[in-house]
Amino acid sequence: MSREMKDSGIEWIGEIPKNWQVLHHKRIMSKIKEICDKYQGEDILSLTMRGVIKRDLENPKGKMPATFDGYQRIKQGNLLLCLFDIDVTPRCVGFIEHNGLTSPAYSQFEMKGSNNARYYDYLLRMIDNDKCFLHLAKNLRSSLTENDFGMIKTIVPPIEEQEKIAKYLDEKIYKVNTVIYETKKIIEEYKKYKQTLIMEVVTRGLDKKVELKYSGVEWIGDIPIGWKVDKIANVYKQRNDKVSDKEYTPLSVTKKGIVLQLENVAKTDNGDNRKLVKSGDFVINSRSDRRGSCGISPYDGSVSLINTVLEPIGTMNNEYYNYVFKTERFADEFYKWGHGIVDDLWSTKWDDMKSIYIPVPSIEEQQEIAGYLKEQIFRIDNMISKKELLIIELENYKKSLIYEYVTGKKEI
């Protein structure tokens, strides 16, 4: 028999079991803050989509401060919250698994009495998924003060139920996350296989028994004996006509190819100074931080000046070279020819690009290879899409599972 329910009075919670309480956050948890005056090698922790994790200081990603002096100490078993920029922060709550230091901008909360921090981690994650606190936030940075947070009402199951719910969700979520992790690994294997297949076929062709020779170009390696290599300048020429986006549809150069620019994309002041693109042109972004953004344009239009527009010369198969240019090894070669002040932000312009050597099979082989790869990549991408859909379904299942149990709509 289902248990008796009551209205919690909290919009994002709905009904809860009749014996559960509704209290302010400040009644069940309290904010603590201990500043570390001098860093002495403690673990540095960050709040991420994966929870509160240890940062790799030897191979850091993202911004790093000059010193960790002045960071705050955080304690295993507490909750870490980000109460600022909650509209754009992917995850605003995490359970602290290990002692360490973190940015003083975060807010640490310690549970009062025997309330279970794991339970409230799940509850607050459920609320954060839908950004339910956003309408309560103040100022341009969408922030909540710790006092504001303390005055927000929450639900309080009996301690025994908190513990049962937390334990049950730990077990269930672990199993789901394991499946998600394994599925992501399979997706990465498919993507690696796709890259390997493209590189092998565009440089060696479809005949496995053909005699090979060294191309003389390091990034290409061996090619069939009947093939040659040539500079890009002998296969494409640069289209460098300057136009306005008022007359020519603005296009975006993405990793998925050339697409119509979205209406909400931030516009620059250079709308009257763009490059002309004709349908069938190949367009590639010259900046290294846009690696892989390229493709054949299906549209007439215009692109920003950072892009290089290539017009095919003579008899060639544009689709074949589209595959060539999308290989990882070509991307390495392309950006190796670039120039810039910052190592990871180089630009490779036409004057550099035109001297890069590329394989040149016969036009018949180009067509055969392009047709074969189109079919194979469609099959691989379809398998990837199915796995990605499975991940979406599992993520939604996790959210549903957490919601139903932390709000008492399902009983363990």
Label every model-predicted segment:
Residues 1-13, 18-19, 157-211, 360-412:
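Amphipathic alpha-helical coiled-coil/heptad-repeat segments
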Residues 3-36, 151, 159, 163, ...:
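Non-catalytic DNA-recognition/assembly elements of restriction-modification systems
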Residues 3-11, 100-107, 138-163, 287, ...:
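A short glycine-rich beta-alpha junction/loop motif
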Residues 8-9, 23-37, 41-76, 233-279:
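Sequence-specific dsDNA recognition surfaces
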Residues 40-60, 79-104, 118-122, 131-135, ...:
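Short, ligand-facing micro-motifs at secondary-structure edges
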Residues 111-116, 312-317:
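Ligand-binding loop in jelly-roll beta-barrel domains
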